[in-house]
Amino acid sequence: DLYDRSLRLSKINEKIGPLFNINDNKKLNKLGLHSKLDLSSNLVGEFPELQGTMLKYLAKLNGFSKDMQFAFEDQYKPVGLNKNMPRNKLGSILSVSNNIDTLSCFFSIGLIPTGSRDPFALRRSGNSLINILWHETNTLSLNQLINSLDKKLSKDVKLVNEIKFFLIDRLYNFLIEEGFRSDKLSAIISKDNIDQKTFLEIK
């Protein structure tokens, strides 16, 4: 349910915050715990396009800081490879947490995209996640990202590998879109921790 998801997001936020040079665990925890409050409202139920935006106004009324208000509104950005990014690092953290949580939940019950079938838009979630990590951090540490998941999930070797290979595939496609040559990517793209400088040197 929404409460359980909010708890998961708060924990993921704390673990990936350092990737974005954000170490305020109290704020990261609060961000996750309140990130889905608008989804239980009748207004968002009737107009789902208002999710996030509705929460921003609720946060404003309840005295949340402006950076958290923006983060609540921007948590669903970017859409895939779209360049419309969150306005601050808190928004980026919450977006990445949302997407890695979504992937882990679907993958854990065997709902993995195959061929052209992707009814739950999981490739888009993967693209959004890679997009933010590329533009907002200095590393693409897939291990650290996956280790941010619930302990039970992060110890499931099969699940971890499925998510990792999926994200590596999304990263490969993202970098091709960014103008990298496929033959030069092959040698380094399967590494767990990837320094962006390594990629930029071969572009």
Predicted regions and their residues:
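Amphipathic alpha-helical "coupling" segments that flank catalytic cores
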Residues: 1-203
